[in-house]
Amino acid sequence: FSQKHHLALEMGTEKAQVYTSFFYEKNQGIALQDERQDYGGRVNASFKLFDDWLEVRPAVDYRQAARNNHYPNFQQAMRNNPTRSPYDPDSETGYNVWINESLDYNVVADAMLEDYYGLDKWFKPEVNLKLNIKPIPGLNYQQVVGYENRQWELHQYWPSTHRSEIDNSRKGHAHLAFSKTENLTSEGYFSYVKDFKGGHNLNATAGYSYFEVNGENFG
């Protein structure tokens, strides 16, 4: 099952335009504890300043995805005895946890008693600057600066009542993981275009490009 919502807004004048879009999306799988929620937005703009000497085009993009994925074993569910209830109203969890049987276990209890939460985040701002050197037709300078940040978080928890904890005589355990990647880009160049009589033209470009990547993680 899924639902999607989108909203877009646009406004502007001859010298300034702004476009924004936002979205929300939720997907829920057939299996228990299998769903995902996404939301995000993007803003683009364009401005002409100082009698068109300077053009500024910023853009910002953000997205977030929250995941709950348990990857239930459908094959195991098909092998289970259909007369054996996965629920037990007398247990503290409400589930019938079958133990010490590696080939016959309650996939419903396994999924419902484990906590899984994964979170993806993307953030990407960028700005493009163009300087038109009007006294010299055809000459301009462009500068692009961009940044990208991506993060991933994972939270998992198995309580003492989970089958894996009972089988291994544990009182529950948790797992936390995190990773972050950052990219930085900077490019700048002069461009000159001149047309001559007879169909000839001159096109010259000179500039630089810089890229940097950093990251960290654990778990």
Annotate each PLM feature.
Residues 46, 126-130, 187-191:
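Short, acidic/charged, Gly/Pro-enriched secondary-structure junctions
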Residues 148, 166-167:
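Glycine-centered small-residue hotspots that permit tight backbone geometry or close packing
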Residues 116-147:
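Charge-patterned, long linear interaction tracts outside catalytic cores
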Residues 41-43, 143, 186:
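Extended, hydrophobic alpha-helical segments in both membrane/secreted and soluble proteins
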Residues 2-23, 27-34, 40-122, 154, ...:
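Flexible loop and strand-edge segments within Gram-negative outer membrane beta-barrel domains
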